[in-house]
């Protein structure tokens, strides 16, 4: 059978969160009542991802930056989570208007991300093209 990759499932989840939606996954049992091993494997892998990044999904709403081809944002209070799913560049413009950015950092490593103020928003200087399935930058507003 054809199962989605963990990366695809994580992208579905992140996109749903960034668009104020829910993700329902239809995983049916086999004739013997057991769940398919591949489905259990994917769920376990998503669980490992959620152990690190769950805070950027649970209890959030779609962020103040609308969804784009590069990804989505989620937000909890003054914490904006930038989920970079598909970026072919080392920098990313965020149309934040006059919103002040106190700090920005890589969510997983906690390393600072350089922020450059520009007309209409800010540019995140990532240092390299993201290769993770979901690079998350947290911005304190």
Model-found features: residue ranges?
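Mature catalytic domains of secreted/periplasmic carbohydrate-active enzymes
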Residues: 1-141
């Amino acid at each position: 059978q054809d199962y989605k990759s963990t990366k695809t499932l994580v992208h579905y989840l992140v996109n749903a969160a960034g668009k104020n939606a829910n993700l329902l996954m239809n995983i049916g049992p086999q004739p013997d009542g057991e769940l398919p091993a591949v489905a259990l494997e994917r769920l376990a892998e998503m669980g490992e991802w959620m152990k690190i990044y769950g805070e950027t999904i649970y209890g959030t709403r779609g962020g103040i930056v609308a969804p784009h081809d590069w990804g989505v944002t989620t937000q909890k209070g003054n914490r904006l989570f930038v989920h970079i799913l598909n970026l072919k560049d080392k920098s990313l413009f965020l149309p934040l208007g006059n919103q002040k950015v106190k700090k920005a950092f890589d969510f997983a490593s906690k390393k600072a991300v350089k922020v450059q103020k520009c007309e209409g928003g800010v540019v995140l200087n990532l240092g390299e093209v993201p290769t993770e399935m979901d690079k998350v930058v947290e911005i304190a507003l």
